[in-house]
C-alpha cells in the first residue's frame, strides 16, 4: 500500500526545513566565532593601551602630588616672610596682592619728563655749540644727570643752567654747594640760526697761561657772544706770581660760547682762576655794536650759502689772530698750558658726524626700493632717497611706490615740497641745482640739506 501524496510532501518539507536549520546553525556558529575573535582582538588592544597609559597616569599623579606639595611650601614661606617683615618693622613689599603701591613723595620732583626732553633735544640737531654730537650722548650720561642737579647741558644751543659739574674734576671737587642761579648772556648759537658742521680746523693745542689770559678777556668773550659785558660780570685782573708761572693749568672753554674761561691748577691754589682783562678798545660803543651787527648779518648771509664752510674758517682765523696778538707781547721761555679739545669745544670729527647722520637716514629708509645710502653724493642723485626719508615720517602724504628713479626732477620737487609744507624745512637746495649737478651732486650741499631735514623731521618721531 503506497503512502498518500500529502504525507510524502510533508516529509519532504520537514527534510528541507532540517537542512535549512542546519545551515542556519552553521552560519550562527561561524558568526559567533568571528565575534569572539573580534572581542579577543579588542581586548588585546585595550590591554596594550592600558599598559602604555599606565606610566603616563602614574607620572601625572606624581606631578599633581608635587604641585600640591610645592603650593603648601610656598604658602608656608609666604607666611614666614610676612612674619619676618612684621617682626623687623618693615612695610609690606610694594606690588604684592592686596598691597597698594606707595604714592610718590610730594617733595621729590619728577625728573623723567626733563630727562626725556633733554634726550630729545640732544637728538634734535648736530650743533657746533653742543658738548657732543653723538646720538647716544644723553643715554650714556643719564646717571650723571640724575646725580648732579646743576650740571651744565648745552645741546643745540639750549643751556638750562650752569654748575660745578660741568668743569673738570679738579674744579668740581672744590664746590661744596652750587652757586645761586643768575642770568647768563645768551650765547651766539641762540642768537643766530643753526649752522651745521662743515669742516674741522686743526689748531695748536698748547697755550701758555698768560697767552690765553691776554687773549680771552671778558670783553673779547662778550664780543664773541654778541653781548656787552654787564657791570656785575666785571672781573678783576689776575697776575700770576713767579712761583705760579711754571705751574700747570688746564683751560676749559664752556660750550655756551667763548665767553667764560676757567682754569684748574694742579696744586692747593684756588680752583677758579680768572684771566686778566685785555685793554678795552677806545672805539665808541654805538659804532662797535653797529659793526658787530653788520658782521653777524654778513655771517648769516654767508652761512645760508652752499657749501657752508664759513664757521670753520672763522674759527681758524680766530685762533691765528690770538696767536699773532699774543706772540708779539710774550716771550718764548714761558710755560705753555695744554688746551684740551674735549673740554674746549666738544666738536667731533666731521667724518663721525656724517657717518652718524648717514646711519640715521639708513634706519629711516630701511626697506624702501631704489634706496641704497652709501654716501652723500650719488646715493641721493635720483631723489628717491629724499622721497623715502620724507615718506617714512609722512606715509599718507604721497604714494612712494608710484615713483620712479628715472623721473629725477619730479622726485626732487615732490620731496622738497613735502618737506617744506609738512615739516617746515626750507629749501636749501633747488631742483635745478640738483639736475645740473647730475649723478654726483656736491656732497656738502646734500649733507647740509639732509642735516636740516634731520633737525625738522625728528620733531615728528
From Swiss-Prot:
UniProtKB keywords: Coiled coil, Phosphoprotein
Organismal lineage: Eukaryota, Metazoa, Chordata, Craniata, Vertebrata
Segments for region (Disordered): 87-193, 227-248, 260-307
Chain intervals with Basic and acidic residues compositional bias: 134-147, 292-301
Coiled-coil region: 55-88
Ranges of compositional bias, category Pro residues: 94-107, 272-285
Phosphoserine: modified positions: 101, 129, 134, 256, 269, 278, 344
UniProt cross-references to PANTHER family, sorted A to Z: CALPONIN HOMOLOGY DOMAIN-CONTAINING PROTEIN DDB_G0272472-RELATED, SMOOTHELIN-LIKE PROTEIN 2
Modified residues (Phosphothreonine): 96, 274
Entry's family note: Belongs to the smoothelin family.
Domain annotation Calponin-homology (CH): ranges: 351-458
Protein name in UniProt: Smoothelin-like protein 2
Organism per entry: Homo sapiens (Human)
Gene3D superfamilies referenced in this protein's UniProt entry, alphabetically: Calponin-like domain (1.10.418.10)
Amino acid at each position: 500500500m503506497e503512502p498518500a501524496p500529502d504525507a510524502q510532501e510533508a516529509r519532504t518539507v520537514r527534510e528541507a526545513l532540517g537542512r535549512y536549520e542546519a545551515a542556519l546553525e552553521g552560519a550562527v556558529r561561524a558568526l559567533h566565532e568571528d565575534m569572539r575573535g573580534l572581542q579577543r582582538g579588542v581586548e588585546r588592544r585595550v590591554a596594550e593601551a592600558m599598559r602604555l597609559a599606565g606610566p603616563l597616569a602614574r607620572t601625572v599623579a606624581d606631578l599633581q602630588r608635587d604641585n600640591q606639595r610645592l603650593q603648601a611650601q610656598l604658602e608656608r614661606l609666604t607666611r614666614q616672610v610676612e612674619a619676618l617683615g612684621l617682626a623687623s618693622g618693615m612695610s609690606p613689599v610694594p606690588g604684592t596682592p592686596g598691597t597698594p603701591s606707595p604714592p610718590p613723595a610730594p617733595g621729590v620732583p619728577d625728573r623723567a619728563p626733563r630727562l626725556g626732553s633733554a634726550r630729545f633735544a640732544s637728538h634734535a640737531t648736530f650743533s657746533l655749540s653742543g658738548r657732543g654730537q653723538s646720538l647716544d650722548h644723553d643715554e650714556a650720561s643719564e646717571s650723571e644727570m640724575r646725580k648732579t642737579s646743576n650740571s651744565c647741558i648745552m645741546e643745540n644751543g639750549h643751556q638750562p643752567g650752569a654748575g660745578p659739574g660741568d668743569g673738570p674734576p679738579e674744579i668740581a671737587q672744590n664746590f661744596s654747594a652750587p652757586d645761586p642761579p643768575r642770568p647768563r648772556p645768551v650765547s651766539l648759537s641762540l642768537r643766530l640760526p643753526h649752522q651745521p658742521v662743515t669742516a674741522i680746523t686743526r689748531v695748536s693745542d698748547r697755550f701758555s697761561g698768560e697767552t690765553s689770559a691776554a687773549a680771552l678777556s671778558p670783553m673779547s668773550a662778550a664780543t664773541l657772544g654778541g653781548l656787552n659785558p654787564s657791570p656785575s660780570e666785571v672781573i678783576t685782573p689776575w697776575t700770576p706770581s713767579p712761583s705760579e708761572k711754571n705751574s700747570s693749568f688746564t683751560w676749559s672753554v664752556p660750550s655756551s660760547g667763548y665767553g667764560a674761561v676757567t682754569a684748574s691748577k694742579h696744586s692747593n691754589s684756588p680752583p677758579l682762576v680768572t684771566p686778566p682783562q685785555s685793554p678795552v678798545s677806545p672805539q665808541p660803543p654805538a659804532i662797535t655794536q653797529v659793526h658787530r651787527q653788520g658782521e653777524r648779518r654778513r655771517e648769516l648771509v654767508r652761512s645760508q650759502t652752499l657749501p657752508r664752510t664759513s664757521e670753520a674758517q672763522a674759527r681758524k682765523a680766530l685762533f691765528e689772530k690770538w696767536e699773532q696778538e699774543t706772540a708779539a707781547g710774550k716771550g718764548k721761555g714761558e710755560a705753555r698750558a695744554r688746551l684740551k679739545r674735549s673740554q674746549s669745544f666738544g666738536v667731533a670729527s666731521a667724518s663721525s658726524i656724517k657717518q652718524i647722520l648717514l646711519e640715521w637716514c639708513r634706519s629711516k629708509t630701511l626697506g624702501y626700493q631704489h634706496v641704497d645710502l652709501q654716501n652723500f653724493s650719488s646715493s641721493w642723485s635720483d631723489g628717491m632717497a629724499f622721497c623715502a626719508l620724507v615718506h617714512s615720517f609722512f606715509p599718507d602724504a604721497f604714494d612712494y611706490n608710484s615713483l620712479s628713479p628715472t623721473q629725477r626732477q619730479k622726485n626732487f620737487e615732490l620731496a622738497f615740497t613735502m618737506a617744506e609744507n609738512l615739516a617746515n624745512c626750507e629749501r636749501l637746495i633747488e631742483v635745478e641745482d640738483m639736475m645740473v649737478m647730475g649723478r654726483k651732486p656736491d656732497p656738502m650741499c646734500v649733507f647740509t640739506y639732509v642735516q636740516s631735514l634731520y633737525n625738522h623731521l625728528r620733531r615728528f618721531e
